[in-house]
C-alpha cells in the first residue's frame, strides 16, 4: 500500500510518500506555475508510485480557512484520483517542520512544504 501526502499551497505543493505504512519520506515539492501544470505533475506522481491513498492537508482555523479549503478541494478534483482521499488537519505542520532544522526558510524551494507533508503522513500512520 502506497500513500501520498500533499501540502497544497498557492505557490508550492509539498509532497511526501509512504510505503506499506512503514517508511515515509518527503519528495521534491511541486512548484506551481498554474493549476493544470501542478495537477499534471501530481497525477504523474500518483501513477509512477502506484498510489492507493491520497492524504491532503486542510487548514483548520484562521481567517482564510474556508477559501483555502475550497481551493484545495478544487485542486484535488483536478487530479481525477479515483481511489481513497483523506483530508487531514495540517495545522502546526509548518511550525513542526521548522523544528527539523533542514529547511532553509529563505529559500522558496518547497523543502519546508514537503516536510509538512511528511509530518502529515507520519501522523496519519502514527510512524
UniProtKB/Swiss-Prot annotation:
MF GO annotations: nuclease activity
NCBIfam families from the UniProt entry: PRK00109.2-2, RNAse_H_YqgF
Purpose of the protein: Could be a nuclease involved in processing of the 5'-end of pre-16S rRNA.
GO biological process, one term: rRNA 5'-end processing
PANTHER family: POLYNUCLEOTIDYL TRANSFERASE, RIBONUCLEASE H-LIKE SUPERFAMILY PROTEIN
Alphabetized SUPFAM superfamilies for the sequence: Ribonuclease H-like
Enzyme Commission number, as recorded: 3.1.-.-
Cellular compartment(s): Cytoplasm
Pfam families tied to this protein: RuvX (PF03652)
Family listed: Belongs to the YqgF nuclease family.
GO cellular component terms, semicolon-separated: cytosol
Protein name as it appears in the record: Putative pre-16S rRNA nuclease
Superkingdom: Bacteria
Organism from which the protein derives: Campylobacter jejuni subsp. jejuni serotype O:23/36 (strain 81-176)
Keywords: Cytoplasm, Hydrolase, Nuclease, Ribosome biogenesis
